[in-house]
Amino acid sequence: MPSKNGPLRIGIGGPVGSGKTALTDKLCKAMREKYSVAVVTNDIYTKEDAEALVRMQALPSERIVGVETGGCPHTAIREDASINLQAIADLNRRIPDLDVVFIESGGDNLAATFSPDLADLTIYVISVCQGEEIPRKGGPGITRSDLLVINKKDLAPYVGADLGVMERDAARMRAEKPFVFSDMKRGDGVERIVEFLTVHGGL
């Protein structure tokens, strides 16, 4: 599929500090042996996330592109995705065999969503540190993303978050849509996320 229709484009969104860059790093490392992978990161005025991924050695630097969105980062993934589409087109020209491109959004609120013109699949990342009530607060990221990742589960006892409550609320808010608890520090949950992307992305 990727060779015929271009690479599978996977949007990764979520609030600041939820673990988007850590997830992107882990997914790149889990998939790079089998697939040709690249990343586009979005930051408001810097290329900090792209530089972090290079430091983490997620991928060779020529496969990681940082775009500076200015203003509201959600605009660059939704209303006017041209800056990201251009970055993907440039990557595709340089690396014609691309199978997967991860698009990491700038940290934003629960209302941020990806334009269907930009992302084939979307992952929304929240952290238990943001409060156990986050899943039930809803918002497009919680309810409409293809996969919800509830990250930093290991910190739940320290922030007073009940994972059982979060699981119940996520199941209710998302109906049949899947969600995964994860701990990116230890890599817990990464295998399930890769499996989801492989199956639902047609890889």
Curated annotation (Swiss-Prot):
Origin: domain of life: Bacteria
Gene Ontology molecular-function annotations: GTP binding; GTPase activity; nickel cation binding
Keywords of this entry: Chaperone, Cytoplasm, GTP-binding, Nickel insertion, Nucleotide-binding
UniProt keyword Cytoplasm present: yes
Cellular component GO terms, alphabetical: cytoplasm
One GO-annotated biological process of the protein: urea catabolic process
Keyword Cytoplasm included in the entry's annotation: yes
Chain sites annotated for binding GTP: 14-21
Entry's localization field: Cytoplasm
Coiled-coil blocks: none
Chain's role: Facilitates the functional incorporation of the urease nickel metallocenter. This process requires GTP hydrolysis, probably effectuated by UreG.
Subunit structure comment from the entry: Homodimer. UreD, UreF and UreG form a complex that acts as a GTP-hydrolysis-dependent molecular chaperone, activating the urease apoprotein by helping to assemble the nickel containing metallocenter of UreC. The UreE protein probably delivers the nickel.
Family: Belongs to the SIMIBI class G3E GTPase family. UreG subfamily.
Protein name: Urease accessory protein UreG
Source organism of this protein record: Rhizobium meliloti (strain 1021)
